[in-house]
């Protein structure tokens, strides 16, 4: 199965990344696709929005999965993945993911830990969507290093548009140095419905 990995990123908060990720994922699932959502934000907003109000009480989250990869420890296929009634799977996140970002700073192959984890899942899903945190730290760089495409929700206003410069600079740097296959899939004023119509294939 050829897996499309899509990072949904913007270092500005409140632009609709989580809503885009959830609705696009459910829309793809309704179209018959096999979809995994990755919560890449230590705040766990995607995890909470999909019916898990206390992420810190979950037994296994993305920080655990990345920790296994980082320490070269065994990881059972699909371990920790939650199944949502609307047809999408979820790898949840909790506040421990912020500690993982600190651990990545001095790690070997630090930009590709998430990609190594997703490589264990690729054959199981047609689409993997990553909800990135509102920053350009190591977690977001990991998402960009793993993705085929990036969707950038942005409001059509001066300051949000101005903030795109730093994100696009990071995207171009990741593309040059780590992931030449990364493509920008969309920069548009947030409307999940139009985004869904233009992004489902």
Labelled PLM ranges:
Residues 1-201:
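P-loop NTP-binding core
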């Amino acid at each position: 199965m050829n897996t499309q990995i899509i990072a949904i990123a913007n270092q500005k908060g409140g632009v609709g990344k989580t809503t885009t990720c959830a609705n696009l994922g459910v829309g793809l699932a309704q179209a018959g696709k096999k979809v995994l959502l990755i919560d890449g934000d230590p705040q766990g907003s995607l995890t909470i929005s999909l019916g898990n109000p206390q992420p810190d009480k979950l037994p296994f989250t993305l920080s655990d999965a990345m920790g296994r990869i980082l320490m070269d420890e065994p990881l059972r296929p699909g371990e920790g993945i939650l199944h949502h009634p609307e047809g999408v799977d979820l790898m949840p996140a909790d506040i421990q993911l912020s500690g993982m970002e600190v651990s990545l700073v001095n790690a070997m192959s630090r930009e590709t830990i998430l990609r190594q984890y997703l490589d264990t899942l690729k054959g199981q899903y047609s689409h993997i969507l990553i909800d990135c945190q509102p920053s350009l730290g190591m977690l977001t760089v990991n998402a960009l290093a793993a993705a085929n495409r990036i969707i950038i929700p942005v409001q059509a206003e001066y300051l949000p548009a101005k903030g795109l410069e730093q994100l696009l600079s990071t995207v171009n740097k990741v593309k040059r140095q780590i992931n030449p296959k990364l493509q920008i899939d969309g920069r548009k004023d947030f409307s999940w419905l139009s985004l869904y119509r233009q992004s489902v294939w």
